[in-house]
Amino acid sequence: MSRQQQFKNREEKILATAEQLLLEAGSGDITLDSLADQLDLAKGTLYKHFSSKDELYLRIIIRYEEQLFNINKIDDSVSAGVSRMILQQLMSPQKALLFNQIEERLAASAQGLNRMFGELYEIRRARMKRLIDLTSGYLQSQNSGLSTRDYLSTIWAIGQGGASLLNSSFYQRYLGRRDTLRVALVQQMLDLPKQYPSVDEEDDDMVDLVNQIDSESEAHIQSQDTSS
């Protein structure tokens, strides 16, 4: 195995272990000392991969976003794709909520992470385009007049709200089984388009959303060219 591959493998192990420690802590923060101890590495070795703890956190979030993107790229049926969109949050509610909290904190206070945030947003925009294709395709298959924008927003709202419920030990005392709640929420989202019969109008929202994403991507590329 080459030294480059060894370095890459070690970095992946660092990210996976740091993610697990974050989830176990539940507070959105860990110490590099505890991470180094868990990995049986010198603390200085961590700095060969990440210049700061904030950079480590953001790299974990980028890795998570890449995993979501790869799941959304599965090409089977649009209904299965829509179901996966919701389940991504409902199956790992703690991770979805915690990583969003960490990202918001980094965006508000961290310094020197503009390039990495640009990388994160590019991956997210690519995933957004895939989600738009899935939701638009499902709406068409259901002959629905619901707009892509409204359907996406509802899916995210239900996913985020459902994740909050599933992550709450207090509300879980009253909500019963987690698996039946997940099934109910997914089924609600699959049934929603049928409540909006088609009026034979084109879904301009889909085109607008794609154009907006493309414009943001072009602006990001131009800003990178200017800064370099």
Place the predicted regions along the sequence by residue.
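Residue-level detection of the helix-turn-helix DNA-binding "recognition helix"
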Residues: 37, 51-52, 62
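Short hydrophobic/aromatic patch on the recognition helix
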Residues: 39-50
